[in-house]
UniProtKB/Swiss-Prot annotation:
Record InterPro entries: DUF4662 (IPR028970)
Domain of life: Eukaryota
Polar residues bias spans: 114-130
Pfam families: DUF4662
Biased composition (Basic and acidic residues): 143-156, 261-280
Species: Homo sapiens
Full protein name: Uncharacterized protein C22orf31
Region (Disordered): 105-156, 259-290
Source taxonomy: Eukaryota, Metazoa, Chordata, Craniata, Vertebrata
Length: 290
């Protein structure tokens, strides 16, 4: 399509579209002018900037970079344009409002760059002035620091290896039949094994050691779980109560339960008999305030 140029106020950069738009049609407060008027305006602009104006046939063309979203309504369309110069006579115009912004940014960037350069120079001069006259940093200083860091790393590594070797030697010296010490392929440390052994030795159930209570439990409970014919009994609530009563009597006969506990296992409470169901305590009803 033939490039149709769009001219705005002379103080604002020109815009153009690759669209078939009628001449003198208002498009976002811009007017679509003929190429001849655009060439005249470009000649005036180049004359102000002391630049040779281009020939009419070599004017700049415009193309749409971003397609409009609504092609039927040009009053609601925002287009992003890009200018293509055939002859580099005039600088490409910027979009509306970007010329001043770019100049401001460039000015700020230049000032920031100058400030950073001056700060670097000051720091360099101050660092030089702080050093005493005739003093230079030895060339081997960096090498010495690197060597010292390497030595520190080696010592730490050697210490870790020694500690690991001691741990391996201690675990291998343990007996193979450690029982609960080895759990899923893991071997406990000697301190942990001693602590566990002490806890097992001091564990008591109703005043009896663990092994004594287990023997008493099996002696009392096992016969009650089987019928005389050798078939297992079907568990019921009555059977559980009988087992509990027999086990309690056996503990009392062994002297494992104190006399006070035999009279009242729970002080301050009335214990139901073996054949009695515990009665739930009824809570008093709260009187609602009217």
């Amino acid at each position: 399509m033939h490039p149709i140029n769009v001219r705005r106020d002379p103080s604002i950069p020109i815009y153009g579209l690759r669209q078939s738009i009628l001449l003198n049609t208002r498009l976002q407060d811009c007017y679509v002018d003929s190429p001849a008027l655009t060439n005249i305006w470009m000649a005036r602009t180049c004359a102000k900037q002391n630049i040779n104006a281009p020939a009419p046939a070599t004017t700049s063309s415009w193309e749409v970079v971003r397609n409009p979203l609504i092609a039927s309504s040009f009053s609601l369309v925002k287009l992003v344009l890009r200018r293509q110069l055939k002859n580099k006579c005039c600088p490409p115009p910027c979009k509306f409002g970007e010329g001043k912004l770019s100049k401001r940014l460039k000015h700020k960037d230049d000032s920031v760059m100058k400030a950073t350069q001056q700060a670097r120079k000051r720091n360099f001069i101050s660092s030089k002035s702080k050093q005493p006259a005739g003093h230079r940093r030895p060339a081997g200083g960096i090498r010495e620091s690197k060597e010292s860091s390497k030595e520190k790393k080696l010592t730490v590594r050697q210490d870790l290896e020694d500690r690991y070797a001691e741990h391996v030697a201690a675990t291998q010296a343990l007996p193979q039949d450690s029982g609960t010490a080895a759990w899923k392929g893991r071997v406990l440390l000697p301190e942990t094994q001693k602590r566990q052994q002490l806890s097992e030795d001091t564990l008591t159930i109703h005043g009896l050691p663990t092994e004594g209570y287990q023997a008493l439990y099996h002696a009392v409970v096992e016969p009650m779980l089987w019928n005389p014919s050798g078939t297992p009994k079907r568990y019921s609530l009555e059977l559980g109560k009988a087992i509990k009563q027999k086990l309690w009597e056996a503990l009392c006969s062994q002297g494992a339960i104190s006399e006070g506990a035999q009279r009242d296992r729970f002080p301050g409470r009335k214990q139901p008999g073996v054949h009695e169901e515990p009665v739930l305590k009824k809570w008093p009803k709260l009187k609602s305030k009217k």
